[in-house]
């Protein structure tokens, strides 16, 4: 049960950090280049990979603390870090599967975003809900 609370607390910390970074990079208008998201995703990718592959955290760090750092803080801070870690892990074993996963992740994400956008626009125009 302790691990669930640690991950939850990490989630609060990670999402709060992401929000603070978005405030630091807010341009005052939308759309603008997503600098905050880029900063969060790139730093999260670095941090997750660093934490999981560093010998101390990999072999000696308490599993509850490791879960709080990775799943909690980094997981709520960004999901891109998880994607990049999985791509690296797949590349070590099966480059073809890594390419398929990467393409599915990118184009699947774009497709879901497009469908969400179109659905929201349709609802906003009264096409589904009146």
What are these regions (language model features)?
Residues 1-130:
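Membrane-interface helix-loop junctions in multi-pass transporters/channels
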């Amino acid at each position: 049960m302790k691990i669930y609370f640690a991950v939850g607390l990490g989630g609060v910390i990670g999402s709060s950090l992401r929000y603070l970074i978005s405030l630091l990079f807010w341009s005052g208008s939308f759309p603008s280049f997503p600098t905050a998201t880029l900063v969060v995703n790139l730093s999260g990718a670095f941090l997750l990979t660093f934490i999981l592959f560093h010998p101390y955290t990999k072999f000696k760090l308490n599993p509850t603390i490791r879960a709080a750092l990775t799943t909690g803080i980094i997981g709520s801070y960004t999901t891109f870090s998880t994607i990049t870690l999985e791509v690296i892990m797949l590349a070590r074993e099966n480059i073809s599967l890594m390419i398929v996963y990467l393409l599915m992740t990118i184009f699947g994400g774009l497709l879901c975003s497009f469908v969400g956008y179109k659905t929201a626009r349709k609802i906003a125009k009264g096409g589904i809900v009146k």
